[in-house]
From Swiss-Prot:
Record pathway: Amino-acid biosynthesis; L-leucine biosynthesis; L-leucine from 3-methyl-2-oxobutanoate: step 2/4
Residues annotated for [4Fe-4S] cluster binding in this entry: 302, 362, 365
Annotated gene: leuC
The organism's taxonomic lineage, starting at the top: Bacteria, Pseudomonadati, Campylobacterota, Epsilonproteobacteria, Campylobacterales
Official protein name in the record: 3-isopropylmalate dehydratase large subunit
Key word Amino-acid biosynthesis present: yes
Organism: Campylobacter curvus (strain 525.92)
Amino acid sequence: MHQTITEKIFSDHVGREVFANEIIESGIDMVIGNDITTPISIKQFERSGATKLANPEGFCIVMDHYIPAKDILSANQAKISRDFAYKHDLKYFFDEKDMGIEHALLPEKGLIVPGDVIIGADSHTCTHGALGAFSTGMGSTDLAYAMITGKNWFKVPPTIKVVFRGKLGRHVYGKDLILEIIRQIGVDGARYKALEFCGETIDALDMDGRFSMCNMAIEAGGKSGIIAVDETTREFLKGKNLRAEPKFFYSDEGAGYERVLEIYADKLDPVIAYPFLPSNGKSVREAVKDDIAIDQAFIGSCTNGRLSDLRIAAEILKGRKVSRKTRLIITPATQKIALAAQKEGLMDIFVEAGAVVSNPTCGACLGGYMGILGAGERCVSTTNRNFVGRMGDRTSEVYLANSAVAAASAIAGKIADPREL
C-alpha cells in the first residue's frame, strides 16, 4: 500500500508496514533533554532503579533555557543535569563552553539524521523534521521511559499535505509561510497530525526557512512537521560528521493524506500574528495601518535566530538607528552562528544601530530573562508563541513576525513594513 514519509519512517523502525492511527512501539534514535526538562526525567530515571542509559549515544542534554544561570534556582536546576551527564560520561552534553539553543545546535552538530525517530522534552522538537526525520515533543516522564528502554509508544499520525506554489516575494520567508498556514487552519487545525510541506516554494526555500516552518508545526497542534530530503538538505549535511547513516524516505504517489492544502506563496505579504494566538495573522500592510507603537523588538530563538536571520536584520539595520523609545535585543541561536556573524561584521552593525546582542539562549522567548516585558509593553518578536504572559507581564503583548519586520519595527518604533524603508 502507498505510504507517507512519516508512515515509512515508522515502518522502518518497527519492521513492518504501519499506517496512520496505528498504535506502535518504536525505537528512538535520539532523545533530547534540556536544563529545564531533564531534571524531572533524571528523577524518574533514578526512581525506576535504572543505572544505565539504554542508548547512551542516542541521548543528549543541551543547556539552553537559563544558561548562564539567571539565579540560584536555575543554577541548582542546571547542576542536576551536569551531575548526571558527568556521572554517565555523556558523549552529547552541551553546556556553556559550546552553547546553543537545542533545535539549532543539534542539526549543526550532525546529531539529527534523515530517517531518524527523535523525541525531546520540548514542544519545538518538531523543528528537526526539516531534515526528513520524524521528530516530536513529549513530556519529561516519556523522556525518562526512553532513557531507560530506548523506545516509546506512538499513534502513527495522519498527515496533512501542504503544497506551496509560486515564488516568495521580497522580505517574505519561511516564517511567513508557517504563520499563514496557522492563520488558515487555526491553532488546533493539525492536532496530532504530521504536517508535510512540499511544492516549488519549498524546493526553493533554504534550510533556515525550513527549520522555521517545522519548528512552528506545533503551533497548529501538529505532532510533527516534515520536509522530504532534497539537494538543499544534502548540501546542509555535507561535511557534517553525522551520528549515523542517513535514510531517505519519500511519500508515495497516492499516499493516504487526511487533507491536502494548497497555498499560493507568491500572493503573500510578510505575516504578523497578533496577540494572543499565532493564528491571529494579518499582513504587514494591514498591521502598518493599525499604527501600533512598540517598546521592544526581539530577533532570536529556535525559530529565527539563525545566520540568515541575522543577515536579514543587518541588511535592514545598516546605517540606521533603533528608535529612541524602543529596545532591540538580538540573540544568535548558537555560538557558531554568533562567531560567523562576528566575522561577517554583523555584530558591528547591530551595536552601532543601538541593539543589545546576548549570548545564545532561549531566554527572552519564554519570558525567562534577557528581554522580559513589563506591564503593558509590546514586542515584535521572531519567536513562536504569543499567549498571555509568554514573554513577561500578563498585560504585555507579543506580535510574531519575521526578522526583517522585527528589525524594521525597531527602527520605526512601531510595526513597520521592511519593504517601505
